[in-house]
Each structure stands twice: as C-alpha cells, then as structure tokens.
C-alpha cells in the first residue's frame, strides 16, 4: 500500500493545488504523509522558490503539522525542495538554506550542458551531488521524456553503487521512480540493481 510520496509540487512553483489542498487530498487517499518538493530558485521558468519563499513555506508546513498534532490527526507533511543539480554537481541554494529542509530531491533540469557532455563527466557530476550531506533523493535520474527526448548519458550503475556505499556508512540516499507517464524514470531495468546496492526507491507522481 502506498503510504505517501516525497516529490510533489504546489502552486508555490508549478503545481496546480495549494499546500493545504494537497494535504487534504493525501489524507482523503489514506496516506500517512506527503512530501513537498517545489522547484528551487534557479528554475525561474517553473517559478522556483526564493530563499525567503522557502522559509515562508517551512513555517506553513510547521503550522499545519502542529495543528494536526493538536487534533490527534495521524498525518505529517515533510518540507522538501526539488533542488537543481548544477553542471558541476553542486546544488541550488546555500548549505544553510537547504538545512531547513526535511529532504532534498536533487534533479537535473538545465539539460543543454548535460546532453553535450560524455558519460564520465555527467556521472562524476551526479556523484558529486549525491555526496552532498543535504542530498536525499535523486529525482528522474536521466531527465528523459518518453516520446520527447532521450536522457543524458550517465553510468547509473556507478551512481547507484556510490549511493549504496553512502547508505552503508549511515547516510540515506534514495533513488526516485518518477511515475509521470511522460518520464517513468528511473527505468525499471535498474530497480533490481538499486535494491542489490541497498538503495531505497521512492515512487513519486
């Protein structure tokens, strides 16, 4: 049974429902939690959140959680963000700005640089990203759009191995299956390998 999902966008960026509306819908589905992950500031085309917006959203999440707790409602919002992975593998926002988050979904959106580079360069950049202590979930790992564009070249076996190594050291690194019918990314062929490496899979809409 699906208990929740961690990669969800609200009207604060490019989603179609408010935070409260999404929380209500999740509760109606019987979910135990909902993770918010609006776009980060660099992705202005999708109304990415400024650092001040991030703080405001964090306060809204905290207020909703406190209200449910006071009423005995067994439901929790997690405050995350879909932080862009930049071309060198660094993450959008400063470390301090990301530290207020419950989770970070790291994703590549600035594709022109990535599609021009070879597999080794892209793999190194992704590994740099996942090694950041604030990084939690690798979002739509190849950036592909089914029927639209191929993903960028990357050695996902190497990336998943490194995630597994970090998990063995006590960190939590998760790979996403983005279940949008336009993405289905992570490709199913890597799911067993992720499990073998000790990398949890997060299924998100």
Region roles according to the model:
Residues 5-21, 111-117:
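Active-site mouth loops of central-metabolism enzymes
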Residues 3-15, 36-41, 137-143:
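Histidine-centered catalytic micro-motifs
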Residues 20-35, 59-68:
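Alpha-helical scaffold segments that flank or form the walls of functional sites
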Residues 7, 26, 38, 77, ...:
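Divalent metal-coordination and catalytic microenvironments
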Residues 180, 199-205:
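Short acidic/histidine-rich active-site segments
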Residues 1-2, 44-170:
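Extended substrate/RNA-proximal surfaces in nucleic-acid metabolism proteins
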Residues 30, 170-172, 198:
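Glycine-centered short loops/turns at secondary-structure junctions
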């Amino acid at each position: 049974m699906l208990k929740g999902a961690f990669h969800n966008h609200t009207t604060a960026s490019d989603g179609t429902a408010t935070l409260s509306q999404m929380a209500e819908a999740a509760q109606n589905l019987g979910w135990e939690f909902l993770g918010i992950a609006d776009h980060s500031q660099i992705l202005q085309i999708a109304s990415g959140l400024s650092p001040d917006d991030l703080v405001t959203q964090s306060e809204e999440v905290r207020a909703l959680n406190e209200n449910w707790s006071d009423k005995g409602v067994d439901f929790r919002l997690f405050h995350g963000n879909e932080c862009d992975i930049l071309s060198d593998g660094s993450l959008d926002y400063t470390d301090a700005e990301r530290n207020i988050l419950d989770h970070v979904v790291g994703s590549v959106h600035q594709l022109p640089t990535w599609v021009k580079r070879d597999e080794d360069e892209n793999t190194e950049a992704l590994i740099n990203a996942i090694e950041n202590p604030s990084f939690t979930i690798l979002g739509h790992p190849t950036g592909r759009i089914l029927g639209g564009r191929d993903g960028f070249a990357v050695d996902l076996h190497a990336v998943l191995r490194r995630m597994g190594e970090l998990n063995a050291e006590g960190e939590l690194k998760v790979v996403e299956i983005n279940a949008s019918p336009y993405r289905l990314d992570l490709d199913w062929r890597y799911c067993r390998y992720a499990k073998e490496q000790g990398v949890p899979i997060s299924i998100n809409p």
